[in-house]
């Protein structure tokens, strides 16, 4: 079912519509929240807070907007607010990633876990604007144009934040 139809059904208090939206986008949203917060519990709380707000006010979303992009932006904003309000420091403790095959042996689990840890630590060192753009582009699979629209900045700004963020990640890793 198309997103617009689901949002319309949600505005008519259809709980199944919210359930479908949640299951369609929760993994992508959790990935972005985790990349921004580096704390699995805080990331999950962030996504749930966004869905609670969205369920209470689906009319806030303009009909012409991309639902996934809108929810990604809500998660990014919520994560930034958590960081500002609580001065949330990344915990650097992550759940074991689920990479099939690589975790079949203890060495594979250790390598995957160490790589994930290094990436999350490096992401946490980026300035918030760069971390947001890198997360939305890589983890959220959003195009630069979509990110620019959601952040309400120029596409050149998004591209430069991404470029500088990636350059810094390379130096950190």
Question: Model regions: which residues?
Answer:
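Short, Lys/Arg-enriched C-terminal cap helix and immediately downstream tail that follows
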Residues: 33, 84, 131, 166-173
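Arg/Lys-rich amphipathic alpha helix in sigma70-family domain 2
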Residues: 59-63, 73-93, 112
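Internal acidic/polar
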Residues: 89-116
